[in-house]
């Protein structure tokens, strides 16, 4: 178990995004931040729809990925349409609830102290994840 170099207690940081895999910018920048947190005594964990991190530090939620069929359907119905149909709003909230429930599981399983969202709030590829 790692201990924080500032307070000598253990802390867990949870990174959240659609994907932490490969060499895209978000994955590379998150790896840098995880290294910084790890060097000061935090332990890093990852929540996403695609992961290439060790399973003991990963929490896979398929609906978090922007390529998930339901997420792609929401995206298609929100962008390029002048009016959003009510079924789309219902679907967004249904998916949001599912992702939120899994997020609580992630927080509890890894005893997360700090959440770091990576592009989940700024880029609307996965609207339910951003909500």
Predicted features and spans:
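Short, electropositive, low-hydrophobicity segments enriched in small/polar residues
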Residues: 18, 29, 52-53
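Surface-exposed cleft-lining segments at the edges of enzyme active sites
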Residues: 88-90, 119-122
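A conserved catalytic-core segment of Leloir-type glycosyltransferases
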Residues: 2, 7-10, 36-114
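Nucleotide-activated donor-dependent transferases that construct or modify glycoconjugates
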Residues: 4-23, 114-121
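Charged helix-capping and loop-helix junction motifs
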Residues: 128-131
């Amino acid at each position: 178990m790692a201990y924080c170099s500032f307070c000598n207690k253990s802390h867990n940081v949870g990174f959240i995004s659609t994907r932490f895999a490969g060499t895209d910018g978000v994955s590379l920048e998150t790896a840098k931040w995880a290294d910084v947190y790890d060097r000061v005594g935090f332990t890093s964990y990852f929540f996403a729809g695609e992961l290439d991190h060790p399973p003991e530090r990963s929490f896979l939620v398929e609906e978090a990925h922007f390529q998930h069929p339901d997420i792609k359907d929401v995206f298609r119905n929100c962008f390029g349409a002048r009016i959003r149909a009510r079924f789309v709003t219902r679907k967004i909230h249904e998916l949001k609830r599912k992702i939120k429930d899994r997020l609580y599981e992630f927080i509890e399983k890894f005893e997360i102290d700090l959440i770091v969202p990576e592009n989940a709030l700024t880029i609307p590829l996965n609207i339910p994840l951003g909500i």
